[in-house]
Protein backbone atom coordinates (compact mmCIF):
# COMPACT_ATOMS: atom_id res chain seq x y z
CA UNK A 1 0.00 0.00 0.00
CA UNK A 2 1.44 3.32 -1.04
CA UNK A 3 1.82 5.89 1.76
CA UNK A 4 0.70 9.42 0.98
CA UNK A 5 2.12 12.39 2.80
CA UNK A 6 0.79 15.88 3.17
CA UNK A 7 2.75 18.37 1.09
CA UNK A 8 2.35 22.03 1.92
CA UNK A 9 4.41 22.94 -1.14
CA UNK A 10 4.03 20.55 -4.08
CA UNK A 11 7.13 18.80 -5.39
CA UNK A 12 8.58 20.45 -8.45
CA UNK A 13 7.70 24.00 -7.38
CA UNK A 14 9.94 26.39 -9.30
CA UNK A 15 9.34 29.83 -7.84
CA UNK A 16 12.20 32.07 -8.95
CA UNK A 17 13.48 33.55 -5.67
CA UNK A 18 16.76 34.69 -7.17
CA UNK A 19 14.93 36.82 -9.75
CA UNK A 20 13.98 39.34 -7.04
CA UNK A 21 17.28 39.36 -5.17
CA UNK A 22 18.33 42.88 -6.18
CA UNK A 23 14.99 44.41 -5.18
CA UNK A 24 15.04 42.45 -1.91
CA UNK A 25 18.61 43.44 -1.06
CA UNK A 26 18.03 47.14 -1.85
CA UNK A 27 14.85 47.12 0.25
CA UNK A 28 16.65 45.39 3.12
CA UNK A 29 19.53 47.88 3.04
CA UNK A 30 17.08 50.82 3.19
CA UNK A 31 15.12 49.30 6.09
CA UNK A 32 18.32 48.44 7.98
CA UNK A 33 19.67 51.97 7.60
CA UNK A 34 16.37 53.42 8.84
CA UNK A 35 16.46 51.14 11.89
CA UNK A 36 20.06 52.09 12.70
CA UNK A 37 19.17 55.76 12.33
CA UNK A 38 16.18 55.29 14.63
CA UNK A 39 18.22 53.34 17.20
CA UNK A 40 21.12 55.79 17.41
CA UNK A 41 19.85 59.23 16.31
CA UNK A 42 16.06 59.60 16.51
CA UNK A 43 13.95 58.55 18.35
CA UNK A 44 16.64 56.18 19.74
CA UNK A 45 16.14 52.99 21.70
CA UNK A 46 14.06 53.13 24.85
CA UNK A 47 16.79 51.73 27.09
CA UNK A 48 15.60 49.94 30.20
CA UNK A 49 17.20 50.38 33.58
CA UNK A 50 19.65 47.54 32.73
CA UNK A 51 21.41 49.75 30.18
CA UNK A 52 20.44 53.33 30.99
CA UNK A 53 20.95 53.09 34.73
CA UNK A 54 18.59 54.60 37.27
CA UNK A 55 15.63 53.33 39.25
CA UNK A 56 12.75 51.33 37.80
CA UNK A 57 9.56 50.60 39.73
CA UNK A 58 6.70 48.28 38.90
CA UNK A 59 3.62 49.86 40.50
CA UNK A 60 0.18 48.29 40.84
CA UNK A 61 -2.94 50.42 41.36
CA UNK A 62 -6.21 49.01 42.66
CA UNK A 63 -8.18 51.42 40.50
CA UNK A 64 -8.01 52.79 36.97
CA UNK A 65 -5.17 55.28 36.52
CA UNK A 66 -3.80 56.86 33.34
CA UNK A 67 -0.10 56.85 32.49
CA UNK A 68 -0.15 60.62 32.03
CA UNK A 69 -1.42 61.13 35.60
CA UNK A 70 1.38 58.98 37.01
CA UNK A 71 3.97 60.80 34.88
CA UNK A 72 2.76 64.21 36.06
CA UNK A 73 2.85 63.16 39.71
CA UNK A 74 6.37 61.71 39.49
CA UNK A 75 7.61 64.77 37.58
CA UNK A 76 6.80 66.95 40.60
CA UNK A 77 9.37 65.08 42.72
CA UNK A 78 12.40 66.55 40.97
CA UNK A 79 13.80 63.43 39.28
CA UNK A 80 13.77 64.94 35.81
CA UNK A 81 11.52 63.62 33.04
CA UNK A 82 10.33 60.13 34.09
CA UNK A 83 9.43 57.31 31.70
CA UNK A 84 6.04 55.76 32.44
CA UNK A 85 4.56 52.90 30.42
CA UNK A 86 1.78 50.42 31.02
CA UNK A 87 2.86 46.95 32.15
CA UNK A 88 0.63 44.09 31.03
CA UNK A 89 -2.92 44.69 29.84
CA UNK A 90 -5.04 47.69 30.75
CA UNK A 91 -7.21 45.79 33.24
CA UNK A 92 -4.20 45.01 35.46
CA UNK A 93 -3.52 48.70 36.20
CA UNK A 94 0.24 48.21 36.41
CA UNK A 95 2.92 50.62 35.24
CA UNK A 96 6.70 50.70 34.89
CA UNK A 97 8.13 53.98 36.13
CA UNK A 98 11.77 54.76 35.41
CA UNK A 99 13.81 57.73 36.63
CA UNK A 100 17.48 58.46 36.04
CA UNK A 101 18.33 58.82 39.73
CA UNK A 102 19.38 55.74 41.72
CA UNK A 103 19.73 57.58 45.03
CA UNK A 104 18.37 60.57 46.89
CA UNK A 105 21.58 60.74 48.85
CA UNK A 106 24.29 62.80 47.14
CA UNK A 107 27.96 63.10 48.04
CA UNK A 108 27.32 66.55 49.51
CA UNK A 109 24.54 65.24 51.78
CA UNK A 110 26.71 62.29 52.81
CA UNK A 111 29.54 64.66 53.79
CA UNK A 112 27.07 66.71 55.84
CA UNK A 113 25.83 63.58 57.64
CA UNK A 114 29.42 62.53 58.35
CA UNK A 115 30.31 65.92 59.84
CA UNK A 116 27.20 66.00 62.08
CA UNK A 117 27.72 62.46 63.41
CA UNK A 118 31.45 63.00 63.89
CA UNK A 119 30.63 65.98 66.07
CA UNK A 120 27.89 64.20 68.06
CA UNK A 121 29.66 60.83 68.37
CA UNK A 122 33.46 61.22 68.65
CA UNK A 123 33.91 57.42 68.71
CA UNK A 124 33.19 57.30 64.95
CA UNK A 125 36.33 56.27 63.06
CA UNK A 126 35.04 56.34 59.49
CA UNK A 127 32.13 56.48 57.02
CA UNK A 128 31.87 55.09 53.49
CA UNK A 129 29.47 56.22 50.77
CA UNK A 130 29.43 55.02 47.14
CA UNK A 131 27.10 56.94 44.77
CA UNK A 132 27.09 53.92 42.44
CA UNK A 133 25.62 51.70 45.15
CA UNK A 134 22.79 54.02 46.12
CA UNK A 135 21.24 55.00 49.42
CA UNK A 136 23.57 53.32 51.88
CA UNK A 137 26.00 54.64 54.48
CA UNK A 138 28.57 52.42 56.23
CA UNK A 139 29.79 53.67 59.62
CA UNK A 140 32.65 52.42 61.80
CA UNK A 141 32.81 53.10 65.56
CA UNK A 142 35.37 52.22 68.21
CA UNK A 143 32.68 50.75 70.45
CA UNK A 144 29.02 49.67 70.24
CA UNK A 145 26.48 52.49 69.92
CA UNK A 146 22.71 52.79 70.17
CA UNK A 147 21.13 52.17 66.75
CA UNK A 148 18.22 54.50 67.51
CA UNK A 149 20.64 57.33 68.25
CA UNK A 150 22.42 56.77 64.94
CA UNK A 151 19.10 56.77 63.08
CA UNK A 152 17.95 60.02 64.69
CA UNK A 153 21.27 61.76 63.94
CA UNK A 154 21.15 60.77 60.26
CA UNK A 155 17.51 61.91 59.97
CA UNK A 156 18.35 65.14 61.79
CA UNK A 157 20.84 65.85 58.98
CA UNK A 158 17.92 65.75 56.52
CA UNK A 159 18.20 62.16 55.27
CA UNK A 160 15.19 59.86 55.97
CA UNK A 161 16.24 56.39 57.15
CA UNK A 162 14.62 53.04 56.29
CA UNK A 163 16.77 50.70 58.35
CA UNK A 164 19.88 50.52 60.56
CA UNK A 165 21.84 47.25 60.56
CA UNK A 166 24.52 46.37 63.10
CA UNK A 167 27.22 44.11 61.66
CA UNK A 168 28.68 41.52 64.01
CA UNK A 169 32.18 42.21 65.30
CA UNK A 170 34.57 40.66 67.76
CA UNK A 171 35.38 42.12 71.13
CA UNK A 172 38.04 44.78 70.84
CA UNK A 173 37.39 45.41 67.14
CA UNK A 174 35.69 48.44 65.59
CA UNK A 175 31.92 48.05 65.24
CA UNK A 176 30.30 48.55 61.84
CA UNK A 177 26.78 49.79 61.13
CA UNK A 178 24.98 50.11 57.81
CA UNK A 179 22.30 52.77 57.43
CA UNK A 180 19.84 52.22 54.56
CA UNK A 181 18.28 55.53 53.60
CA UNK A 182 15.15 56.16 51.59
CA UNK A 183 15.61 56.06 47.81
CA UNK A 184 13.68 57.31 44.79
CA UNK A 185 11.42 54.25 44.97
CA UNK A 186 10.30 55.12 48.50
CA UNK A 187 9.70 58.74 47.58
CA UNK A 188 7.73 57.87 44.42
CA UNK A 189 5.67 55.23 46.22
CA UNK A 190 4.90 57.64 49.06
CA UNK A 191 3.86 60.41 46.67
CA UNK A 192 1.51 58.10 44.73
CA UNK A 193 -0.07 56.77 47.93
CA UNK A 194 -0.58 60.32 49.12
CA UNK A 195 -2.26 61.15 45.78
CA UNK A 196 -4.47 58.07 45.33
CA UNK A 197 -4.86 56.74 48.87
CA UNK A 198 -2.72 54.68 51.28
CA UNK A 199 -3.88 51.34 49.83
CA UNK A 200 -4.32 52.45 46.22
CA UNK A 201 -0.70 52.13 45.03
CA UNK A 202 1.67 49.23 45.71
CA UNK A 203 5.32 49.15 44.66
CA UNK A 204 5.64 45.56 43.42
CA UNK A 205 9.30 45.70 42.41
CA UNK A 206 12.19 48.14 42.53
CA UNK A 207 15.42 47.79 40.51
CA UNK A 208 18.52 49.95 40.80
CA UNK A 209 21.39 50.06 38.29
CA UNK A 210 24.22 52.58 38.47
CA UNK A 211 25.19 54.46 35.28
CA UNK A 212 28.62 52.79 35.05
CA UNK A 213 27.10 49.34 35.51
CA UNK A 214 24.51 50.18 32.82
CA UNK A 215 27.25 51.12 30.34
CA UNK A 216 29.14 47.92 31.11
CA UNK A 217 26.02 45.80 30.61
CA UNK A 218 25.36 47.54 27.29
CA UNK A 219 28.91 46.82 26.12
CA UNK A 220 28.68 43.20 27.27
CA UNK A 221 25.40 42.78 25.38
CA UNK A 222 26.94 44.03 22.13
CA UNK A 223 29.98 41.79 22.62
CA UNK A 224 27.75 38.76 23.25
CA UNK A 225 26.06 39.24 19.86
CA UNK A 226 29.40 39.79 18.09
CA UNK A 227 30.98 36.72 19.70
CA UNK A 228 28.00 34.59 18.67
CA UNK A 229 28.27 35.77 15.06
CA UNK A 230 32.03 35.19 15.04
CA UNK A 231 31.64 31.59 16.21
CA UNK A 232 28.91 31.01 13.61
CA UNK A 233 31.22 32.41 10.90
CA UNK A 234 33.92 29.90 11.86
CA UNK A 235 31.43 27.01 12.08
CA UNK A 236 29.93 27.67 8.65
CA UNK A 237 33.38 28.11 7.14
CA UNK A 238 34.53 24.69 8.38
CA UNK A 239 31.28 22.86 7.65
CA UNK A 240 30.79 24.21 4.14
CA UNK A 241 33.18 26.63 2.53
CA UNK A 242 34.30 30.09 3.55
CA UNK A 243 32.47 31.42 0.49
CA UNK A 244 29.26 30.57 2.36
CA UNK A 245 30.23 32.39 5.57
CA UNK A 246 29.78 36.03 4.44
CA UNK A 247 26.23 35.32 3.31
CA UNK A 248 25.36 33.82 6.70
CA UNK A 249 26.88 36.69 8.67
CA UNK A 250 25.22 39.38 6.53
CA UNK A 251 21.89 37.58 6.94
CA UNK A 252 22.37 37.38 10.72
CA UNK A 253 23.29 41.06 10.95
CA UNK A 254 20.15 41.80 8.92
CA UNK A 255 17.99 39.73 11.30
CA UNK A 256 19.54 41.30 14.40
CA UNK A 257 18.90 44.81 13.05
CA UNK A 258 15.31 43.99 12.04
CA UNK A 259 14.66 42.62 15.55
CA UNK A 260 16.21 45.80 16.94
CA UNK A 261 13.78 47.72 14.75
CA UNK A 262 10.88 46.12 16.63
CA UNK A 263 12.05 47.88 19.81
CA UNK A 264 12.62 51.17 17.95
CA UNK A 265 9.12 51.20 16.43
CA UNK A 266 7.13 49.89 19.42
CA UNK A 267 9.14 51.87 22.02
CA UNK A 268 9.23 48.79 24.24
CA UNK A 269 12.10 48.72 26.70
CA UNK A 270 15.43 47.50 25.37
CA UNK A 271 17.11 45.58 28.17
CA UNK A 272 19.01 42.36 28.85
CA UNK A 273 15.97 40.31 27.85
CA UNK A 274 16.04 42.09 24.47
CA UNK A 275 19.65 40.98 23.96
CA UNK A 276 18.50 37.43 24.73
CA UNK A 277 15.85 37.80 22.01
CA UNK A 278 18.46 38.89 19.45
CA UNK A 279 20.76 35.99 20.34
CA UNK A 280 17.83 33.56 20.06
CA UNK A 281 16.86 34.99 16.67
CA UNK A 282 20.46 34.68 15.47
CA UNK A 283 20.57 31.02 16.52
CA UNK A 284 17.21 30.25 14.95
CA UNK A 285 18.05 32.05 11.72
CA UNK A 286 21.39 30.33 11.20
CA UNK A 287 19.71 26.94 11.67
CA UNK A 288 17.28 27.75 8.85
CA UNK A 289 20.09 28.98 6.61
CA UNK A 290 22.28 25.92 7.22
CA UNK A 291 19.43 23.60 6.20
CA UNK A 292 19.21 25.39 2.84
CA UNK A 293 23.01 25.42 2.49
CA UNK A 294 23.07 21.66 3.09
CA UNK A 295 20.64 21.18 0.22
CA UNK A 296 22.71 23.52 -1.99
CA UNK A 297 25.79 21.39 -1.32
CA UNK A 298 23.90 18.17 -2.11
CA UNK A 299 22.45 19.59 -5.33
CA UNK A 300 25.83 20.98 -6.40
CA UNK A 301 27.21 17.42 -6.31
CA UNK A 302 24.08 15.94 -7.92
CA UNK A 303 23.80 18.51 -10.73
CA UNK A 304 27.41 19.17 -11.65
CA UNK A 305 27.75 21.62 -14.50
CA UNK A 306 24.55 23.55 -13.77
CA UNK A 307 24.94 27.24 -12.92
CA UNK A 308 25.05 27.97 -9.18
CA UNK A 309 22.11 30.36 -9.61
CA UNK A 310 19.87 27.47 -10.72
CA UNK A 311 21.16 25.16 -7.98
CA UNK A 312 20.46 27.74 -5.26
CA UNK A 313 16.97 28.43 -6.56
CA UNK A 314 16.25 24.69 -6.81
CA UNK A 315 17.47 24.14 -3.25
CA UNK A 316 15.31 26.94 -1.81
CA UNK A 317 12.24 25.53 -3.58
CA UNK A 318 12.95 22.00 -2.34
CA UNK A 319 13.21 23.22 1.27
CA UNK A 320 10.31 25.67 0.99
CA UNK A 321 7.74 23.42 2.64
CA UNK A 322 10.04 22.50 5.52
CA UNK A 323 10.97 26.13 6.13
CA UNK A 324 7.35 27.29 6.17
CA UNK A 325 6.21 24.44 8.45
CA UNK A 326 9.09 24.88 10.91
CA UNK A 327 8.76 28.66 11.09
CA UNK A 328 4.97 28.42 11.18
CA UNK A 329 4.97 25.94 14.08
CA UNK A 330 7.32 28.18 16.07
CA UNK A 331 5.22 31.23 15.22
CA UNK A 332 2.05 29.51 16.49
CA UNK A 333 3.66 28.81 19.86
CA UNK A 334 4.76 32.45 20.04
CA UNK A 335 1.22 33.62 19.27
CA UNK A 336 0.10 31.74 22.38
CA UNK A 337 2.67 33.61 24.47
CA UNK A 338 1.63 36.91 22.89
CA UNK A 339 -2.04 36.34 23.70
CA UNK A 340 -1.60 34.86 27.18
CA UNK A 341 1.66 36.46 28.30
CA UNK A 342 2.26 39.87 29.83
CA UNK A 343 5.17 42.23 30.25
CA UNK A 344 8.60 40.83 29.45
CA UNK A 345 7.27 37.47 28.20
CA UNK A 346 4.96 39.19 25.73
CA UNK A 347 7.74 41.50 24.51
CA UNK A 348 10.03 38.49 24.06
CA UNK A 349 7.42 36.61 22.01
CA UNK A 350 6.59 39.61 19.81
CA UNK A 351 10.25 40.33 19.06
CA UNK A 352 10.91 36.64 18.38
CA UNK A 353 8.01 36.52 15.92
CA UNK A 354 9.49 39.47 14.02
CA UNK A 355 12.92 37.80 14.11
CA UNK A 356 11.62 34.47 12.78
CA UNK A 357 9.89 36.16 9.84
CA UNK A 358 13.07 38.13 9.15
CA UNK A 359 15.20 34.97 9.43
CA UNK A 360 13.08 33.11 6.88
CA UNK A 361 13.22 36.08 4.50
CA UNK A 362 16.99 36.52 4.90
CA UNK A 363 17.65 32.84 4.11
CA UNK A 364 15.83 33.20 0.79
CA UNK A 365 16.81 36.71 -0.25
CA UNK A 366 20.03 37.60 1.61
CA UNK A 367 22.24 34.60 2.45
CA UNK A 368 21.65 32.53 -0.69
CA UNK A 369 21.96 35.41 -3.21
CA UNK A 370 25.13 36.56 -1.42
CA UNK A 371 26.67 33.13 -2.06
CA UNK A 372 25.83 33.47 -5.76
CA UNK A 373 27.33 36.96 -5.90
CA UNK A 374 30.58 35.80 -4.28
CA UNK A 375 30.84 32.86 -6.70
CA UNK A 376 30.18 35.08 -9.74
CA UNK A 377 32.62 37.68 -8.45
CA UNK A 378 35.38 35.07 -7.98
CA UNK A 379 34.72 33.66 -11.48
CA UNK A 380 34.97 37.14 -13.00
CA UNK A 381 38.21 37.72 -11.13
CA UNK A 382 39.66 34.43 -12.41
CA UNK A 383 38.59 35.32 -15.98
CA UNK A 384 40.22 38.76 -15.74
CA UNK A 385 43.42 37.26 -14.34
CA UNK A 386 43.49 34.67 -17.14
CA UNK A 387 42.97 37.38 -19.79
CA UNK A 388 45.90 39.47 -18.56
CA UNK A 389 49.02 39.21 -20.79
CA UNK A 390 51.67 37.01 -19.20
CA UNK A 391 55.16 38.41 -18.59
CA UNK A 392 57.76 37.45 -21.23
CA UNK A 393 59.71 35.21 -18.88
CA UNK A 394 56.53 33.19 -18.14
CA UNK A 395 55.77 32.91 -21.90
CA UNK A 396 59.29 31.67 -22.56
CA UNK A 397 59.02 29.13 -19.79
CA UNK A 398 55.69 27.93 -21.19
CA UNK A 399 57.24 27.59 -24.70
CA UNK A 400 59.94 25.28 -23.37
What are these regions (language model features)?
Residues 1-400:
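A structural signal for conserved, well-ordered secondary-structure elements
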Amino acid sequence: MEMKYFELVKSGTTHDFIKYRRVAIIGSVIVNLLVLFGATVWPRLNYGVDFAGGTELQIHFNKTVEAGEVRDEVSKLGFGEPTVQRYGNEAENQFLVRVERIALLTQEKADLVKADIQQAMPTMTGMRFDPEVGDKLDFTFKQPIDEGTLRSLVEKAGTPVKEVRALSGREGQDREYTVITQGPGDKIGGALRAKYGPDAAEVVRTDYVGPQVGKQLRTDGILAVLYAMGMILIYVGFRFDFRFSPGVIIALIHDAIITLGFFVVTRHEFNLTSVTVILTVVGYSVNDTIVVYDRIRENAQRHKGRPLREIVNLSINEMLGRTILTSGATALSLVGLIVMGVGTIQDFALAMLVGIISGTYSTWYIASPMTIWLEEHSEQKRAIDAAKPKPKNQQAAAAR
